């Protein structure tokens, strides 16, 4: 199920810029294994969901998965073949702003071999370079 905020204060946001490294959400909090971002990017709610599904499918019933990022930034897109001007486009999809060091997914309750494979499948769905890390 794609996630997006139930309600926001404003419909549209500035694009902003991704400077520096992530100081929040860069430590393992819930599970034992995690996937950590190494590059700055926007990760869409579809990509987050694809990674979550891949991990869940590989791990089957065993283990628990935590998604540590949430898409809370609306991205606007203008209709195709529209002339310049006449305001900003309408919100099309949601993204999560990810900086280097940010934990994307965590996993626990499975062996390291299973976790490594499940997380590598999820990593292949991400648009950036990532690394597998172990708590400790």
From Swiss-Prot:
Domain of life: Eukaryota
Cellular-component GO terms for this entry: chloroplast; mitochondrial large ribosomal subunit
PROSITE patterns cross-referenced by the UniProt entry: RIBOSOMAL_L16_1 (PS00586), RIBOSOMAL_L16_2 (PS00701)
Localization of this protein: Plastid, Chloroplast
NCBIfam families the UniProt entry points to: rplP_bact
PANTHER family according to UniProt: 50S/60S RIBOSOMAL PROTEIN L16, LARGE RIBOSOMAL SUBUNIT PROTEIN UL16M
Name of the protein this chain belongs to: Large ribosomal subunit protein uL16c
Organism: Buxus microphylla
Gene: rpl16
